[in-house]
Amino acid sequence: FSLCVGVLADETTAAEPTDETAGELAGQIVILHTNDVHGAIDGYAKVAALKADYEAKGAEVLLVDAGDFIQGTTSVSVSQGATAVELMNLAGYDLVTLGNHEFDYGMDNLKTIFAKAEFGVVAANIKLNGAAAFDANKVVELADGTKLGVFGLATPETATKANPAKIKGVTFLAESELYACAEAQVKALTEAGCEYIICLGHLGIDNESEPNRSIDLLGKVSGIDVF
């Protein structure tokens, strides 16, 4: 298998596969990702169509979201994110990690809405009362036996951006602890036989986010194939 990565935008459209295109992507792994959707749920139909199009052409498709999907519009906020989870189930998402806005409605709400999720939730650097709050990673095994190792990282800035009452007991590994966490995930997934290591991260990009930005992490941690 070879690996392709795609980013989805609102303009995404998908064409029906023809006899000529069916099977043309056999042997390809396609990773589609969204992030910072912020309740723009109208785009999920396009996401689902694009995933189906790639699959119809023979590709193995992994559809992921890198956080901030349960907040931002009335369409999702009125249900405290439950509507977003329902539509992401229908769109065929495989894995997500968490953004800071996932904590707008509190940890208990996350547990409630994710209980109905048909996709995995990975976040290796989030602790609840000192213990892992979510699964750290997921091994995805493809039809030919190829293994993809995916781990999640949430921004440590959530600790200062979220309402303290909503994240009581929740801590986020940051700086050197964040790097060590990522290194441990790479090691564990490599030892599990994963051919590709994918970090699904919701980390800052601005200067004020240093040293917890994606570029800071990638400068310190080796072995990540896709971020």
Give the positions of each predicted feature.
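Acidic, metal/ion-coordinating pockets
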Residues: D10-F227
